[in-house]
Amino acid sequence: MMSVPETPSHAAPQATFETLTAERIAELVAIERLAYSHPWTARNFADSLQAGYNCQLLVAGATLLGYFVAMQGVDEVHLLNITVAPQAQ
Protein backbone atom coordinates (compact mmCIF):
# COMPACT_ATOMS: atom_id res chain seq x y z
CA MET A 1 0.00 0.00 0.00
CA MET A 2 1.36 3.41 -0.96
CA SER A 3 1.28 6.23 1.54
CA VAL A 4 0.65 9.87 0.78
CA PRO A 5 3.75 11.98 1.43
CA GLU A 6 3.42 14.51 4.18
CA THR A 7 3.52 18.19 3.25
CA PRO A 8 6.70 19.73 4.62
CA SER A 9 6.16 22.49 7.16
CA HIS A 10 8.23 24.83 4.95
CA ALA A 11 5.94 24.39 1.93
CA ALA A 12 5.16 27.48 -0.13
CA PRO A 13 1.81 29.18 0.54
CA GLN A 14 -1.13 27.99 -1.55
CA ALA A 15 -1.73 30.14 -4.65
CA THR A 16 -5.19 31.72 -4.83
CA PHE A 17 -7.01 34.23 -7.01
CA GLU A 18 -8.06 37.65 -5.71
CA THR A 19 -10.04 40.36 -7.49
CA LEU A 20 -7.95 43.36 -8.52
CA THR A 21 -8.68 46.61 -6.66
CA ALA A 22 -7.56 50.09 -7.68
CA GLU A 23 -5.17 50.15 -4.70
CA ARG A 24 -3.08 47.34 -6.24
CA ILE A 25 -2.72 48.72 -9.78
CA ALA A 26 0.77 50.10 -9.08
CA GLU A 27 1.98 46.55 -8.35
CA LEU A 28 0.74 45.39 -11.75
CA VAL A 29 2.35 48.33 -13.53
CA ALA A 30 5.70 47.45 -11.92
CA ILE A 31 5.41 43.85 -13.16
CA GLU A 32 4.28 45.01 -16.62
CA ARG A 33 7.44 47.11 -16.94
CA LEU A 34 9.61 44.11 -16.10
CA ALA A 35 7.71 41.68 -18.33
CA TYR A 36 7.02 43.64 -21.53
CA SER A 37 8.66 46.11 -23.88
CA HIS A 38 5.23 47.79 -24.38
CA PRO A 39 3.55 47.45 -20.97
CA TRP A 40 0.02 48.36 -20.01
CA THR A 41 -0.26 51.62 -18.09
CA ALA A 42 -2.05 52.29 -14.82
CA ARG A 43 -4.80 53.90 -16.91
CA ASN A 44 -5.27 50.67 -18.93
CA PHE A 45 -5.88 48.73 -15.71
CA ALA A 46 -8.11 51.45 -14.22
CA ASP A 47 -10.20 51.56 -17.41
CA SER A 48 -10.54 47.77 -17.33
CA LEU A 49 -11.81 47.90 -13.75
CA GLN A 50 -14.24 50.71 -14.59
CA ALA A 51 -15.53 48.76 -17.62
CA GLY A 52 -16.31 45.81 -15.35
CA TYR A 53 -13.80 43.41 -16.90
CA ASN A 54 -12.75 40.39 -14.87
CA CYS A 55 -9.38 41.37 -13.37
CA GLN A 56 -7.85 38.67 -11.18
CA LEU A 57 -4.56 38.43 -9.30
CA LEU A 58 -2.77 35.15 -8.59
CA VAL A 59 -1.16 35.44 -5.16
CA ALA A 60 0.71 33.14 -2.81
CA GLY A 61 0.68 34.67 0.63
CA ALA A 62 1.79 38.28 0.12
CA THR A 63 3.53 37.53 -3.21
CA LEU A 64 1.89 38.58 -6.47
CA LEU A 65 2.63 35.80 -8.98
CA GLY A 66 0.59 37.03 -11.93
CA TYR A 67 -2.73 38.34 -13.16
CA PHE A 68 -5.20 38.39 -16.01
CA VAL A 69 -7.77 40.78 -17.46
CA ALA A 70 -10.68 39.24 -19.37
CA MET A 71 -13.68 40.72 -21.18
CA GLN A 72 -16.87 38.64 -21.32
CA GLY A 73 -18.43 38.33 -24.76
CA VAL A 74 -21.75 36.75 -25.74
CA ASP A 75 -20.55 33.14 -25.80
CA GLU A 76 -16.86 33.75 -25.30
CA VAL A 77 -14.25 35.46 -23.17
CA HIS A 78 -11.51 37.68 -24.59
CA LEU A 79 -8.28 37.46 -22.65
CA LEU A 80 -6.91 41.01 -22.82
CA ASN A 81 -3.83 40.58 -20.64
CA ILE A 82 -2.23 37.60 -18.94
CA THR A 83 1.07 37.98 -17.16
CA VAL A 84 3.26 35.87 -14.90
CA ALA A 85 5.67 37.94 -12.85
CA PRO A 86 9.20 37.36 -14.20
CA GLN A 87 10.43 36.17 -10.79
CA ALA A 88 7.67 33.51 -10.77
CA GLN A 89 8.33 32.17 -14.28
Which residues fall in each region the model found?
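Acetyl-CoA-dependent GNAT
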Residues: 2-89
